């Protein structure tokens, strides 16, 4: 009885602690765990919510033609993929463009999980078309491809690697004006309609990388929940895994005021800035939505980039494909076990949101508790049993680690720094989940 009482008291104390202000400025979760910023560098003191304008509503897609008319668009590029080009979301967009007298051309050769090669094909189409506006209808792959096409068509003399993130590319800042881009997402999870990020597989190195600049973010995102009704079951699940993992990553990330270096000019503040009071609210809300409804995305990048023969169910593609949401979630139990020691209270809180009973939990057990909660979640949703189930083996681990190392823009926001040995151990632990 005494043990149960003590456990109840500990649970109530944790709840009271969570009721207090948890923003990074007032929380000391990380203050004892992390040392000072690297020598010669200073940490940031601000964060910025640099996102696209968003319009939400069932049926809002039909307004796209009026939006383009209001922008003065005369020659529009409509980008999508082969599958979606035959489905209602694209037809609704085309009907709206025709109704409002907008001239347009369709590019429907977007590759699901794009590559540098597929980006360049879309870029050539955009350069030849001399478009004055773009509409992207699809998931993250379509929106990212359209961002890249808009960028390089607006900067036709640039080499492809000029704007690609360092160290793979040159990471040059975007200084040219881009054309308006309206994003019409048909999946939930990527959030590409709000960001200045375009992700692709760089085939030469077999890794995912991208372009990150606020200049390429869409002008407007039209969020129409009716489009999700056309998603196959497994696409719905993998999109949900994207939401789950990115919400966990956001909430447990290094706080914005501990990220270094501090930018010398606000224009160079990165897209990924760390946890902050605003994103914390949305991350927790997203986790609650996932916990309630789902059962009814750094380490994922090399997994997707090095895919061999695996083809995800419900994805009608002619190439091997590991969807981003799946590649993220397969490593999540190992990753959050690893990061928990730096912010155990937040890891326990997320485990509780996802259904774990944390009343008798000890702080040192935060990682294993969250990992077990995630495993049960994935098992109930019939997710593949780890990396081995989608074609990887221990022999692939060195290449997976090599593919993770260039992803500093993402991995440096993890609350716990990682060595190559740490990454290797995480991939090995992710070979089998159950």
Protein language model features and the residues they cover:
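Carboxylate- and glycine-rich phosphate/diphosphate-binding segment that chelates Mg2+/Mn2+
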Residues: 195-297
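Generic secondary-structure signature for well-ordered alpha-helical cores
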Residues: 69, 98-103, 124-128, 151-154, ...
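C-terminal charged capping/lid subdomain of soluble metabolic enzymes
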Residues: 5-34, 347-434
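ATP/NTP phosphate-donor binding region
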Residues: 14-133, 387
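Glycine/threonine-rich beta-strand-loop-alpha-helix active-site module
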Residues: 117-223
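Active-site segments that bind and position negatively charged phosphate/pyrophosphate groups
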Residues: 255-373
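Active-site nucleophile and cofactor-binding loops and adjacent substrate-binding regions
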Residues: 110-114, 137-139, 299, 320-325
């Amino acid at each position: 009885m005494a043990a149960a009482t003590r456990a109840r008291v500990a649970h109530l104390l944790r709840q009271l602690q969570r009721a207090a202000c948890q923003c990074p400025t007032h929380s000391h979760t990380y203050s004892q765990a992390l040392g000072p910023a690297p020598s010669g560098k200073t940490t940031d003191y601000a964060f910025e919510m640099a996102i696209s304008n968003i319009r939400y509503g069932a049926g809002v897609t039909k307004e796209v033609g009026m939006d383009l008319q209001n922008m003065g668009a005369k020659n529009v590029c409509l980008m999508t993929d082969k599958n979606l080009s035959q489905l209602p979301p694209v037809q609704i967009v085309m009907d709206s463009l025709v109704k409002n007298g907008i001239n347009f051309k369709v590019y429907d050769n977007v590759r699901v999980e794009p590559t540098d090669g597929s980006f360049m094909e879309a870029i050539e189409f955009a350069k030849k078309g001399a478009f004055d506006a773009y509409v992207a209808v699809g998931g993250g792959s379509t929106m990212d491809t359209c961002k890249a096409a808009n960028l390089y068509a607006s900067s036709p003399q640039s080499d492809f690697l000029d704007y690609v993130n360092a160290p793979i590319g040159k990471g040059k800042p975007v200084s040219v004006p881009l054309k308006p881009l309206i994003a019409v997402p048909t999946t939930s999870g990527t959030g590409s309609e709000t960001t200045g990020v375009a992700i692709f597989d760089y085939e030469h190195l077999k890794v995912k990388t991208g372009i990150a600049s606020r200049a390429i973010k869409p002008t407007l995102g039209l969020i129409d929940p009716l489009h999700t009704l056309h998603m196959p079951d497994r696409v719905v699940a993998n999109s949900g895994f994207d939401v789950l993992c990115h919400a966990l990553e956001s909430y447990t990330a290094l706080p914005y005021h501990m990220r270094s270096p501090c930018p010398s000019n606000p224009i160079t503040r990165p897209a990924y800035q760390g946890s902050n009071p605003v994103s914390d609210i949305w991350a927790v809300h997203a986790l609650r939505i996932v916990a309630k409804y789902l059962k009814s995305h750094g380490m994922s990048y090399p997994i997707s980039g090095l895919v061999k023969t695996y083809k995800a169910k419900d994805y009608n593609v002619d190439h091997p494909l590991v969807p981003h949401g799946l590649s993220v979630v397969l490593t999540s139990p190992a990753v959050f076990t690893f990061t928990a020691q730096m912010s155990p209270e937040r890891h326990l809180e997320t485990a509780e949101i996802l259904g774990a009973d944390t009343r008798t939990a000890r702080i040192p057990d935060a990682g294993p508790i969250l990992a077990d909660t995630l495993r049960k979640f994935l098992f109930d949703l019939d997710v593949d049993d780890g990396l081995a189930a989608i074609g990887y083996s221990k022999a692939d681990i060195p290449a997976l680690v090599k593919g993770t190392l260039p992803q500093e823009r993402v991995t440096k926001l993890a609350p716990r720094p990682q060595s190559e040995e740490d990454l290797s151990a995480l991939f090995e632990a992710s070979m089998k989940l159950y």
